Amino acid sequence: LSDRFGRRPVLIISIAGATADYLLMAAAPSLLWLYIGRIFAGITGANMAVATAYVSDITPAHERAKRFGLLGAVFGIGFIAGPVIGGVLGEWNLHAPFFAAAFMNGINLIMTAVLLKESKHSNKMTEKVQEQSILKKLSYLITQPNMAPLLGIFLIITLVSQVPATLWVIYGQDRYGWSIFIAGVSLASYGICHSIAQAFAIAPMVKRFGEKNTLLCGIACDAIGLLLLSIAVEEWVPFALLPLFALGGVAVPALQAMMSRGISDERQGELQGLLSSFNSLGAIIGPVLVTSLYFMTQASAPGMVWALAAILYVITLPLLLKYRLNKYSGVP
């Protein structure tokens, strides 16, 4: 939709939907209305995909990894601050976190409507592309040179990322006896380190090593961190591994930049929408698989899930070897 009608109107509709959703949840008289609010939010929830496409529109190809990293860093900060603010407000009033979220989305909506200009590449989708079905558009993306292996890598990273997202606190409490406070500090530290790496490490790494090698470095760091965590028995080790996991966070911005190079300007929204769908799919499937495997192996091999996640990264190596820069890059 954003490729056809422009980023700005789709962003406005998406943010307006989020605002309405939180207002509805704040005033919900029953659980049914909470579900209705969540369904409505799901229908209009495209802001991250469209925002990423917008960044791709206004950024030269050789700087996209840096901008995607900054976008990820900002998202990470929100991921850390949001639960803290919600927890504090929830102690005062159970409805307050939802009203606060609606208020912040409302401010975001006003700023988007007043300050955000349409990106230069929006509305460039040709009539032929507009008439294509969704399946045909997806087929086009997947069959582009390099895109299939890069999408495979993205899906693997998405699935692997569900291991710490799902198990970090549970594993810390089971394996190391973390208190709720220590678990919270460790989770916040994990997010802060990731945000710092994405904000400040991605640009110099891409400049020095290139996007492909930066992606490889990020995967290697994350895999090593996962392997070491799988055998760690001391409670301080996860904290010591945070820099490795943080460097692992540079992989996704570099990968996004590589994929955006291989797609024409008129298809950037489709690409980011597909990646957003992969993220959603991973968030649905990942936790179920991760928790099931963890509780099956917890007694005999508590660190097996982390080791298997690291081993899963091995699949990315032959996929990455197939990558070659294609005609849309414009940059050697």
Could you say what each language-model-derived stretch is?
Residues 1-6, 197-211, 294:
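Helix-to-loop junctions at the C-terminal end of transmembrane segments
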Residues 1-29:
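Conserved MFS/SLC helix-loop-helix module at the cytosolic interface between two early adjacent transmembrane helices
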Residues 37-76:
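Cytoplasmic helix-loop-helix junction between adjacent transmembrane helices
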Residues 90-103, 292-313:
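A membrane-interface helix-boundary motif in multi-pass transporters
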Residues 109-115, 307-332:
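Multi-pass alpha-helical transporter architecture, strongest
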Residues 117-153, 175:
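Juxtamembrane intracellular "pre-TM" segments in multi-pass secondary transporters
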Residues 166-183:
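Short amphipathic helix-loop junctions that connect adjacent transmembrane helices
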Residues 212-255:
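C-terminal transmembrane helical hairpin of 12-TM major facilitator-type secondary transporters
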